[in-house]
């Protein structure tokens, strides 16, 4: 771990690479620090640092320790991004809590909801639905995409959709049926000519 602060970037890269293979909760903070302090031009070092964070987070024995640590805002922001590559109910719960209390760019927000919806424990799905409905109140297309992601996640776990989830799906379906566009190719009903082909 001490080698992460060595003056030589080469030594720091090697040290970070080693910590990707030997996982421990105490490795996370120095790896986050290494990433934050690395020159933006040193993409290899920054990537290796994030890879180390991800691999340490993927260790089920260490994840609860990591989630119990009080992180500062900069560390939380990095963790929330890296966790999107960690298939875990615990980290999905962490990401949902981060979304609830922090602003983030729209595309990152969508990716974060996609991730959380896929891995969240069933007990938190309704919380995710509430947040999604608030964040994307006027964007039903995004809501529908996230609805499908969550639905697939529930099915993969062998669970059943909650009443709130069912209500959300019914509401979205009703919205799209009531707002079918005349220009839409999927839903548009066009007259047929004598051959049975649609008339343009």
Kindly give the residue locations of the regions a language model identified.
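Long, ordered, helix-rich scaffold segments
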Residues: 1-200
